[in-house]
């Protein structure tokens, strides 16, 4: 009983420290001039490296999935760049609520927006399927500024306070947040039936009940949601990648053409086909800038075996 109490107390203190750190970085990056934000980034990167030090082998494995030739110094440099990119994600996301439409428009280059417009013209909604790549939050803010309703399904965190902080952050710039729980499916379909946009981070199977695919040469599972909702509602399924570009707040977004969701067999077979086609698109997007792929958790069966060993 005492051990459980001590563990809970320690976890609560850790959560409080993390939340405090996030809030400090959030407030500082909002008021500092662009030249000073680089200093904050330099401070934040080592902190993230400490908190996520156990994830370095996983990040290295992911870098080698994309670029098997990476070894030694080049691999270590790729891993370090991934941590730097992750720090930049948080810093530039925290800056979003205080930036104007003019600021956002000037800082992001979007290719393939016509795929979203054409899909919305069909009246069945749009599913934007994303890997954890670059500064994806910026694409959401930009879409909202174009006059579109954006819904995002988000993972519930172990810390309710931390989860609320990020929900409030996204709501502050117009995102309708759908928590990933037993009500999420209904909320997603309602949004699509209203011809809205739903964003789904789709390269990690959080619930462990996804669809088996081949992803960078190894079998694993990915979320069933994108394929299921697209086939169920007829909503267009569009892969999207957002990348950091050179310079503070500079981003590039690429919207790929819609994945084919035409029914050809059973629902199960069609879901498998659509999920695999989507992952092939993710591989294209990730290969463009693999060091910006923020996947710091085991995602393949071999990751879990390596972690145990």
Q: How does the language model describe each region?
A:
Residues 2-6, 10-13, 32, 51, ...:
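Non-catalytic C-terminal accessory region of glycerolipid acyltransferases
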Residues 88, 122-182, 208-215, 244, ...:
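Catalytic core of membrane glycerolipid acyltransferases/transacylases, capturing the structured
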């Amino acid at each position: 009983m005492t051990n459980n109490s001590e563990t809970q107390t320690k976890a609560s203190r850790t959560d409080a420290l993390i939340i405090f750190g996030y809030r400090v970085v959030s407030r500082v990056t909002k008021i500092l001039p662009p030249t000073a934000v680089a200093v904050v980034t330099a401070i934040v990167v080592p902190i993230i490296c400490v908190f996520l030090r156990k994830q370095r082998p996983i990040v290295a494995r992911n870098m080698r999935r994309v670029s098997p030739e990476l070894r030694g110094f080049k691999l270590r440099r790729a891993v370090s760049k991934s941590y730097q990119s992750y720090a930049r994600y948080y810093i530039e996301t925290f800056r979003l609520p205080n930036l104007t439409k003019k600021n956002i428009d000037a800082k992001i280059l979007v290719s393939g927006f016509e795929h979203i417009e054409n899909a919305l013209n069909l009246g069945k909604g749009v599913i934007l399927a994303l890997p954890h790549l670059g500064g994806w939050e910026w694409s959401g803010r930009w879409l909202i500024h174009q006059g579109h309703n954006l819904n995002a399904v988000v993972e519930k965190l172990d810390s309710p306070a931390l989860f609320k902080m990020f929900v409030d952050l996204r709501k502050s710039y117009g995102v309708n947040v759908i928590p990933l729980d037993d009500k999420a499916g209904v909320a997603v379909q309602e949004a699509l039936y209203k011809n809205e946009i739903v964003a789904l981070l789709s390269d990690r199977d959080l619930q462990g009940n996804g669809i088996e695919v081949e992803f960078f040469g190894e079998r694993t599972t990915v979320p069933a949601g994108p394929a299921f909702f697209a086939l169920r509602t007829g909503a267009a399924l569009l892969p999207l990648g957002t990348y950091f570009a050179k310079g503070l707040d500079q981003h590039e977004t690429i919207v790929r053409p819609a994945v084919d969701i035409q029914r050809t067999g059973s629902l199960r077979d069609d879901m498998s086909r659509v999920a695999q086609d989507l992952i092939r698109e993710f591989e294209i997007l990730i290969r463009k800038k693999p060091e910006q792929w923020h996947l710091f958790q085991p995602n393949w069966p071999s990751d879990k075996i390596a972690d145990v060993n």
